[in-house]
Every structure is written in structure tokens, then in C-alpha cells.
């Protein structure tokens, strides 16, 4: 059995430039893929630029289906002040496939009004084809995951979090 080949892709810029198989999900004060947070730090009271990412099945292999997409964050967002990691990922009342728009650092970005889970969600929270019950049976993409970090003026720098992406693969 050959497992499916899966990568995380990110879209940036006006007109949407897609980068395949990104190396990190770092967030900061500019719209950039594989961002260096030291070069683009987030000032207290500011918001990161929204990230638009997709789970991309580049080859289904001998699998019959990829589904049950789950995304969450582990690790603290920092000390002092109020921080929020907001997203369009949700367990219920899914708003359907999010359309790409030039990334901004203002909030709220349409449909990114949920708190990013900090543990594995019980069920899918990112859709395929506009539905949380969607599935890929050939090479293809998830819906966009939109996510962004917001802070207040009392926030202090220096946090590290990890984005987690999980899916079910059926033989």
C-alpha cells in the first residue's frame, strides 16, 4: 500500500501566489510565506496578517479517501495582555469554503471569528468542498484555513506555538 502524499500550501499577496509544501506557519507583521518572526515581529496591540492555508493531497496513492480534517494549535500565545488565535475552522455551523482575499492585518476577517482549538478537535473542523463531511478521493485541496493572531497593548513578545494538521486516510 502506498500512502497518500500530503502537503500544506499557503497563498499570499494580491492576486494569490501559492507556495507548495511550506516549511512553517510563522505569523507576523507582514504577508509572507515561511515568515521569519524575528524580521517581522508583532507589536503589542497589533494583529498578524491572516494566513490562508490548504491541506493539499498531491497523490492519493492506493488510498481511497482523505477526510476528517482537523487543525489546532499547541503551545502558549505569550504572557501579559490578551491574545487570541482566531480562525474560520469550526465544528458546527461551518460557513463553507472560504474565498481567498489579499491578506490583511485587520480584524475581524470574514468568517474568522472562532478561537483556534488548543487540543485535537473531536470531529472535523476544516472542510473539503465546502463541507465538514467532504472527502478527497483523488489529488485535491481542502477548503482554505484562515487564521490570525490578535493582541492587545499589554501583550509581550516571545511565544512559540505549533500548528497541527490531522486527517483520516482510508485504504
Regions found by a protein language model. Give the residues of each.
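Long, small/polar-residue-biased beta-strand-and-loop interaction regions
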Residues: 1-171
Amino acid at each position: 500500500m502506498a500512502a497518500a502524499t500530503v502537503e500544506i500550501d499557503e497563498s499570499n499577496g494580491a492576486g494569490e501566489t501559492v507556495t507548495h509544501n511550506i516549511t512553517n506557519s510563522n505569523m507576523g507583521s507582514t504577508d509572507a510565506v515561511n515568515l521569519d518572526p524575528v524580521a517581522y515581529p508583532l507589536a503589542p496591540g497589533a494583529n498578524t496578517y491572516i494566513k490562508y492555508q490548504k491541506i493539499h493531497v498531491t497523490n492519493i496513492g492506493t488510498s481511497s479517501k482523505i477526510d476528517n480534517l482537523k487543525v489546532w494549535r499547541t503551545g502558549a500565545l505569550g504572557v501579559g495582555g490578551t491574545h487570541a488565535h482566531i480562525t474560520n475552522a469550526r465544528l458546527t455551523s461551518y460557513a463553507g469554503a472560504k474565498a481567498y482575499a489579499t491578506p490583511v492585518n485587520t480584524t475581524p476577517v470574514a468568517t474568522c471569528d472562532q478561537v483556534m482549538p488548543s487540543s485535537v478537535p473531536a470531529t472535523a473542523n476544516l472542510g473539503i468542498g465546502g463541507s465538514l463531511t467532504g472527502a478527497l478521493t483523488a489529488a485535491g485541496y481542502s477548503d482554505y484555513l484562515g487564521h490570525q493572531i490578535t493582541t492587545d497593548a499589554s501583550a509581550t513578545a516571545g511565544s512559540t506555538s505549533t500548528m497541527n494538521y490531522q486527517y483520516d486516510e482510508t485504504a
